[in-house]
Regions:
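Helix-to-loop junction immediately C-terminal to a conserved catalytic motif
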Residues: 59
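Conserved ABC ATPase "signature" region
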Residues: 74-75, 91, 110, 121-135
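The feature captures the beta-strand-to-loop junction immediately N-terminal to the Walker
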Residues: 44-46
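ABC ATPase NBD Q-loop/coupling interface
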Residues: 68-85
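ABC-family P-loop ATPase nucleotide-binding domain
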Residues: 1-19
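Short coil-to-beta microelement around the adenine-binding A-loop and adjacent beta1/P-loop entry
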Residues: 25-26, 84
Length: 135
């Protein structure tokens, strides 16, 4: 029997009753969220409210224990191929602008295109410099 996806029409990201615990601490409690293509969202809340954990679960840097996360029609589950496809397409901005503080901004911007998309260093740097020129 095939599983029916309940993702709202054209949703880019859907979280359905997502739960996450750190030991006994229930950090994400039945989170439901729908993000449409092109929509920008901001997760606001006090320290410890689950903002970063939610973002990390969407990119499967953290594993949620219950519920469903669907990104562009791809359900995040144990299938590593699904996780890799989502990581290639989903960009995230964390609380700190540099993911790897020991690296330059340029190296932070080129590491994913080079390692995940197998772009040459020159191509990745060219794209990064074009993007930096916009800010």
């Amino acid at each position: 029997m095939s599983q029916i996806l309940l993702q709202p029409a054209n949703a880019m990201i859907t979280l359905e009753n997502v739960n996450k615990w750190y030991g006994q601490f229930h950090v994400l409690k039945n989170i439901n969220l729908t993000v449409q293509p092109g929509e920008r969202i901001v997760l606001c809340g006090p320290s410890g409210s689950g903002k970063s954990t939610t973002i990390r679960c969407i990119n499967h840097l953290e594993e949620h224990q219950q519920g469903r996360i669907v990104v562009d029609g791809i359900e995040l589950n144990e299938d590593i191929r699904n996780i890799e496809r989502v990581r290639q397409e989903v960009g995230m901005v964390f609380q700190h602008f540099n993911l790897f503080p020991h690296m330059t901004i340029l190296k932070n911007m080129t590491i994913a295109p080079m390692q995940l998309l197998h772009k040459s260093k020159e191509e990745a740097e060219k794209t990064a410099l074009e993007l930096l020129g916009r800010v």
